[in-house]
Amino acid sequence: MTQAAEADGAVKVVGDDITNNLSLVRDEVADTAAKVDPEQVAVLARQIVQPGRVFVAGAGRSGLVLRMAAMRLMHFGLTVHVAGDTTTPAISAGDLLLVASGSGTTSGVVKSAETAKKAGARIAAFTTNPDSPLAGLADAVVIIPAAQKTDHGSHISRQYAGSLFEQVLFVVTEAVFQSLWDHTEVEAEELWTRHANLE
């Protein structure tokens, strides 16, 4: 039994707890997203629509967010691959690797960026750390001013680990997709034709 559990084994979460923490998450995401430099994001968005394929690479929850972004970019009509999938081809010159790491030091993500750079591909990165190895490899960097997952005593966020980074990463990638779509005359019905029909 954990300290959070009562003697009868039940955790006494009540509605007020949920209300308070919904407000916490909402406010932290809104405050942090407002601090992201929109010009950095615009540069990254322009990289996405340059000629070439788009590859995404991330670890853990950041990687899951990039998978969602990859889906939306596919709906938009781009050729998108997720690093590590069995059908993902080799990246090459002219392609874009979209990566995310809060610390900017995640070994597998940095290695992917190094490999892509050697192949002549462009790198676009999301991170909290502008001085990180990942940021140093990138042609376009978006700094998300959230706590790193190892910063357990941070005043930046009351949430656990890298939650705030991952939440804002999702919001920013959604804003990128929406902004790209806004600059087209493509109807939602056309995007819908690219949704998966094998489920």
Curated annotation (Swiss-Prot):
Catalyzes the isomerization between 3-hexulose 6-phosphate and fructose 6-phosphate. It catalyses: D-arabino-hex-3-ulose 6-phosphate = beta-D-fructose 6-phosphate. Its EC number is 5.3.1.27. GO terms for molecular function: 6-phospho-3-hexuloisomerase activity; carbohydrate derivative binding. Substrate binds at residues 62, 101-106. Keywords: Carbohydrate metabolism, Isomerase. Pathway: One-carbon metabolism; formaldehyde assimilation via RuMP pathway; D-fructose 6-phosphate from D-ribulose 5-phosphate and formaldehyde: step 2/2. CDD domains: SIS_PHI. GO terms for biological process: carbohydrate derivative metabolic process; formaldehyde assimilation via ribulose monophosphate cycle. Belongs to the SIS family. PHI subfamily. This is 3-hexulose-6-phosphate isomerase. Induction: By methanol or methylamine. InterPro entries: PHI/rmpB (IPR017552), SIS_dom (IPR001347), SIS_dom_sf (IPR046348). It is an enzyme of class 5 (isomerase). It comes from Mycobacterium gastri. The gene is rmpB. The active site is at 166 (proton acceptor). Pfam families: SIS (PF01380). PROSITE patterns: SIS. Residues 44-186 form the SIS domain.
